[in-house]
Amino acid sequence: MFKKINTKLTIDGLELLQSLGDCSIDLCFFDPQYRGVLDKMHYGNEGERQKGRSVLVQMSESTIIYFIQEISRVLKPSRYLMLWIDKFHLCEGVRPWLDSTSLEIVDLITWDKMKMGMGYRTRKQSEYLLIVQKKPIKAKGTWKLHNIRDVCSEKIPQNELKTHPHSKPKTLQKTLIESCTNIGDLVCDPAAGSFSVLECCKELGRNFIGTNLESS
């Protein structure tokens, strides 16, 4: 297993996952860096925040599938992958990403970002967190908190968005870590961005292993 836990690694996420042993991770977060709806709709004016996203290392669909296959391998049985997707991928479907894995979609949380984005018709104000579980599928003993709603309203501070345009809601992440892991468990984030998951793990007494590779 890769030994550098609780640090901000800058290696390739696949390299990190490949260094981990089978069934060694208690929880994984994954925010694939795809342009998704931006590429599909060809927006002419993306704005400063979306320009920031465009300089991040982008992942092809085949790369995302490879990540998820590795995540399936390293997750312990009945443990969870928290998979971030946008509206485009929610509508188009991501089920093929899970083919050839032991993973199944078991739930969905909508994140209301409390700030309007782009859109030719409706303006985009939400992202979606697919809750994916490794077989065998079961809720009892794997999900401790039962006050988590399927809609989360949480705004990211503007100064954080300028530095990390793909930042995710820390309070929601912290609640999910608390619900799905125990003290001392190992949480993985192979595309860690601002490393907010690391911050949550430190506050909750969990161990973290993750990396963020940005374009030069």
Give residue ranges: language-model regions.
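SAM-dependent nucleic-acid methyltransferase catalytic core
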Residues: 1-30, 203
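Conserved phosphate-coordination/catalytic loops
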Residues: 8-11, 54-65, 163-171
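Short alpha-helical
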Residues: 15, 88-90, 216
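Glycine/Thr-rich phosphate-binding loops of Rossmann-like dinucleotide-binding domains
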Residues: 17, 38, 91
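Generic structural signal for well-ordered alpha-helical scaffold segments
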Residues: 17-18, 72, 174-178
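SAM-dependent methyltransferase catalytic-core segment centered on the flexible catalytic loop
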Residues: 21-79, 204
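Class I S-adenosyl-L-methionine
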Residues: 34, 38-46, 96-216
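Conserved Class I SAM-dependent methyltransferase catalytic core
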Residues: 57-114
